[in-house]
Every structure is written in structure tokens, then in C-alpha cells.
Amino acid sequence: MQHYGVNGYSLHAMNSLSAMYNLHQQAAQQAQHAPDYRPSVHALTLAERLAGCTFQDIILEARYGSQHRKQRRSRTAFTAQQLEALEKTFQKTHYPDVVMRERLAMCTNLPEARVQVWFKNRRAKFRKKQRSLQKEQLQKQKDCESSHSEGKTEPPVLETQSTIPDTEKTQSIPSEVSTDLNLTLSEQSASESAPEDQTDREEEFKSTLDEAKVDKSPGVDGKALNCKRASPKSESPISATVTPSSSSGLAQTHSYSSSPLSLFRLQEQFRQHMAATNNLVHYSSFEMGTPSAMPYLGMNVNMAPLSSLHCQSYYQSLSHAQQVWSSPILQASSSLPSLNSKTTSIENLRLRAKQHAASLGLDTLPN
């Protein structure tokens, strides 16, 4: 069947033209009943189109023609792969150029216009998120500042409340320590008051002092052993006071406890005499011989330099040795009879002084 007719027009086009002509003839015949109104073909076509079209579509068609009529587009549903590719590109750059958008459109099988609009929306979403984060940070800073300002005003009240129990604790602890010290000091004062009184009497009665020294000499060996066994920490005044066994023995034997103070005075006189003579000789090595039957009171086996032997430290060592003495040794020593006379006790004192001076690095007394 031949579709092309005269002058190259198809049969379909000819049929449409004939149909339009027939419509025009029918309209002309109907218009004869209304002599003042003669509608044109353009008016008829607009009247026909007004039934199914809006006024905006008619204006757009009048401006741009039927091809540029606004078409409604459905919302684009992005797949997971498309969104992943778009997000990766957005992390690299927020403003992709035309070449990057075209490549991304080819990879995601999307039109380039859709990619451009997606990036515009994504940038708007990113800015909105940044603004919300900034608001949250500002709010947190304000909260922190307010909490710091409140914390600066509140802690002094808490500190005052906390310092009250601390002071109570510190007062309670020294009170306990003071009670212990008072007990021990009372025992010491009871044990030392008698020696001081007796030393004053001994200055008047030196003969009784010498006889008392002869009686006390056998118990010195036990005292030296107790001094060796005592730890260095026990030399402190607080720890040295904790000697319950010594207080009872000291209270019972007053004549025995008076020996450290009297010997201390003798040693001080000896040191003053040696300082006056200025005969200080330092021995490089000192060999201790066999100890005599009556070693010098207060003599330590561990030799210390002369500079370290001060009066206070020596008095502390004597008082410590006085407290370390136990009651059985005191009772045993007090029960021993006095066998030596006054002359032997003086010679023994001189011998002990010579031994002590040699141990300290001092020259001996002139005979």
C-alpha cells in the first residue's frame, strides 16, 4: 500500500487535514446562526484545550510552544551504590566541576543535572549540620562556664566543713600522743628525779658513790648486750619511751639508776681537761684488747668518730641504755655483794677512762 500521495504528503497527514477541514466547515455552519461571532481555527483549538489543561500550561505553551511544556518529574530514588559513589566524591570535594559531574553521572547511570542538584542539597545539609554542632559547642561552653562559676563559689563551704573534722582529728591524735607521752614522762621523771637528788648528795659523799659503783659494775655486761640488741630506730625519744619493763626496775633501784648521770659528769670533766691540754691524737686503727672485768659505762662496741659524739646524743644513748635495762638484770646486779674497796674502784675508774679515751682517739691522761 502506498503511503505517500501527491507532493510527498502521507495519507495520514491527508486524513488529518481533511478531518480538520470538516470540523472547520461544521463550525462555520454553526456560526451562521450567530452572525456577530465568527470563531477562528486558533480560538477553537484553545477552547478544546481548555477542558484538560490549566491556565499556566496554556501560557507556557503560548510562550515556548508545545515542546517546552513543563513536565512534572517524579522524585529520584537513589540506590545504595549511587549514594556511596556520591558520598565518596563529596568527601573529596564539595564543589565538583563539570568534568567530575559528568564522570560521576556516567558511573552512577544518572543524568548530570541530577548529580548537580544532589551536590547542592548535600552542601545545604552539611552547612545545617555544622550550624547545629556550633550551637551545641556554644551551649556546652556556657554550661561549663556556669558550672565553674558555681564551683568557685561552692567549694569554700565544703572546705570549711572538711577542715573541721581534720582539725578534730589532729586535735584528737595529739591528745592521744600527749597522754602517752605524759605517762612515759611521768615514769621517766620519777626515775630521773631520784638520780638527780642522789647526784647532789654524791658530790657531798663521794665515798658512798664509789662503793655504789663497785656494786653496780657486774651488771654492765648485760646492759651492753641489751644496747647491741636495740634497733637504731629506738633511739628516738618517742619510741624509746615505750619500755614497760624498765620502768618498774628503775623505780625499785634508785642507787643503780644514778650511775649514768654521775659518770656523764665525770666524762664531761675528762673532756674539758683533754681540751685544755690540746693533745688530740687520731689513731688510724685501734685494736681492742680483752675487756676487763669492769668495762666503762656507756662504752659502745661500734666506734664512732669524735665529731659525732655530742653531749645530747650521748645523753640520749645513756637514757636509752638506762630504759633498755630489764628488771631481772637489775635485781641480779643489786643483789651482788660489794667486794672491792675504795682504792680498787678509783683505779678501775682510771683504767676505764684510759680505755675510753683510746677508743675516742684521745691521748691518755698523764699519770
Swiss-Prot record:
Transmembrane segments: none annotated. GO terms for molecular function: DNA-binding transcription factor activity, RNA polymerase II-specific; RNA polymerase II transcription regulatory region sequence-specific DNA binding. Residues 71-130 bind DNA. CDD domains: homeodomain. The keyword Nucleus applies. In the embryo, expressed in the developing central nervous system and in other tissues including the developing digestive system. At 9.7 dpc, expression is restricted to the midbrain and pretectum. One of its GO terms (cellular component) is nucleus. It is found in: Nucleus. Residues 133-153, 203-218 have a biased composition (Basic and acidic residues). Residues 129-254 are annotated as: Disordered. Residues 159-192, 233-254 have a biased composition (Polar residues). Keywords: Developmental protein, DNA-binding, Homeobox, Nucleus, Repressor, Transcription, Transcription regulation. One of its GO terms (biological process) is regulation of transcription by RNA polymerase II. A motif (OAR) lies at residues 344-357. The keyword Cytoplasm does not apply. Homodimer. Belongs to the paired homeobox family. Functions as a transcriptional repressor. Required for brain development. This is Diencephalon/mesencephalon homeobox protein 1.
